[in-house]
């Protein structure tokens, strides 16, 4: 929180400056306005004190023979090339330069498939002493392994969702991070779907979107899920309470609900909580007395839930933007808030040919979805891929229904195409139910998608994939264990 002694000093400095030099040529200050602005800037910085951005220049070392772990590429002393992150090896000009053009797919300037090591140093601030730290990588293709100061942390994977690496606590001061990104085919899903392929996306290597360290206090909250009920203005909430100490801790949790458009506060509530050691799953129901506005494609009304946990002067604020909307079906009709909706949509096959990867910028997705609306569309099907969170956020604001998917494996992908070699699918993947590798990946990726984007009202449809022609259709049990949106 803002240091009260620092604020007192700032007041004295500003007052002394104005009084000591009333007629000098020094800039004249409006004490109230400047102090207010200064306090606001400090407060905003204080809110961001739990985030440390790692965007900027990194070093990268290619590892085409996958010898980096054996030869300790995670330690210092290895020669690296400079690269700006977020970004890709293609943009930096690393890999094999393409000569001519590739038939039927995007022609990349440079090609590289395999592990690449990204390294840099960073400094942990003193006020992070004893705090739990998580590395957040917004978008990676496909696997990330992390080392801190030569110590292996863990491995994460996923094509359409962020990678979270739990680093534990780090002492204040300088540290070195090494991230091994492997864009090779980790699970055999082939290379013809848009989540992993060269048709409209490329098989890029790098890190996109946010790259940051996130700190949390000893008693913190995580994995917030909201379940709005349009029938009775009720909001069910679930989240994890994490106690990183070795003893039971008492604290306070407050809930505040605001209408984003008007910024009107419509609900506030707080209660004492007891956090046992480890992780506890917590549920809460907020009964909202006043009427709420529903969300749909014509009226994209949004609300912001703020949950703040406080314990012995340490606090953590988490926010979730969501909408009150209900999705049901009546025979052949889809109902949004009990109203039949005709889905007028577009097929999005990851069309970003200038970069070869999807934008993680909200404004860019708002621009795209406003074009949709100008043509009378209200729906987008992301063919065999899942977009970044920016797309869901923009769709929430504009009023677009999203269908996200995982992959595409069809019968012809398991066959060598001698007459059209370019159509031969890498790995010759068998269909789901006959492909243990893909059978493991799909339900895990579906669950990651729900975890990452399930609070967005625009996320109304979830699909395993496209044209699963050689699959065992009993695989629908994949969906039975997934929580409802």
Residues of each region from the PLM?
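Secreted/periplasmic carbohydrate-active enzymes, especially glycoside hydrolases
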Residues: 1-11, 18-385, 389-394, 398-402, ...
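Substrate-binding/catalytic cleft of secreted carbohydrate-active enzymes
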Residues: 369-372, 379-485
């Amino acid at each position: 929180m803002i240091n009260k002694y620092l604020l007192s000093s700032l007041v004295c400095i500003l007052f002394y400056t104005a009084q000591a030099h009333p007629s000098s040529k020094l800039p004249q200050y409006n004490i109230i306005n400047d102090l207010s602005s200064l306090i606001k800037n400090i407060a905003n910085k204080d809110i961001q004190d739990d985030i440390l951005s790692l965007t900027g220049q990194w070093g990268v070392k290619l590892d085409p023979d996958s010898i980096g772990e054996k030869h300790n590429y995670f330690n210092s002393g290895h020669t690296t090339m400079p690269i700006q992150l977020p970004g890709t090896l293609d943009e930096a000009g690393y890999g094999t330069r393409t000569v001519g053009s590739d038939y039927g797919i995007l022609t990349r300037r440079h090609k590289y498939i395999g592990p690449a090591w990204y390294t840099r140093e960073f400094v942990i601030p003193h006020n992070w002493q004893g705090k739990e730290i998580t590395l957040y990588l917004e978008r990676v293709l496909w696997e990330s392994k992390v080392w801190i100061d030569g110590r292996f942390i863990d491995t994460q994977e996923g094509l359409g969702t962020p990678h979270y690496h739990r680093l534990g606590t780090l002492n204040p001061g300088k540290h070195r991070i090494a991230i091994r990104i492997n864009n090779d085919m980790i699970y055999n899903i082939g290379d013809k779907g848009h989540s992993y392929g060269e048709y409209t996306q490329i098989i890029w290597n790098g890190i996109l979107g946010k790259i940051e360290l996130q700190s949390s206090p000893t008693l913190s909250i995580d994995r917030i899920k909201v379940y709005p009920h349009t029938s009775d203005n009720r909001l069910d909430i679930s989240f994890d309470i994490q106690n990183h100490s070795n003893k039971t801790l008492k604290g306070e949790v407050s809930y505040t609900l605001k209408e984003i458009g008007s910024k009107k506060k419509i609900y506030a509530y707080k209660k004492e909580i007891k956090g046992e050691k480890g992780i506890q799953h917590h549920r809460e129901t907020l009964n909202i007395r006043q009427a709420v506005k529903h969300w749909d494609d014509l009226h994209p009304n949004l609300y912001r839930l703020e949950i703040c946990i406080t314990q012995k002067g340490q606090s953590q604020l988490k926010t979730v933007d969501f909408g009150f909307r209900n999705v049901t079906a009546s025979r052949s009709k889809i109902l949004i808030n009990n109203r039949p909706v005709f889905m007028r949509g577009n097929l999005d096959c990851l069309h970003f040919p200038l970069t070869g990867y999807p934008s993680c910028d909200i404004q860019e997705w708002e621009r795209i979805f406003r074009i949709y609306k100008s043509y009378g569309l209200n729906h987008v099907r992301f063919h065999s891929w899942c977009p970044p969170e920016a797309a869901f956020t923009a769709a929430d604001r504009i009023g677009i229904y999203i269908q996200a998917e995982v992959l595409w494996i069809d019968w012809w992908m398991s066959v060598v195409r001698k007459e059209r070699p370019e159509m031969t699918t890498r790995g010759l993947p068998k269909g789901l139910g006959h492909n243990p590798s893909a059978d493991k990946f799909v339900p895990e990726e579906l669950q990651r998608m729900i975890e990452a984007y399930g609070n967005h009202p625009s996320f109304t449809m979830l699909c395993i994939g496209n044209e699963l022609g050689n699959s065992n259709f009993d695989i629908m049990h994949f969906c039975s264990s997934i929580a409802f949106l």
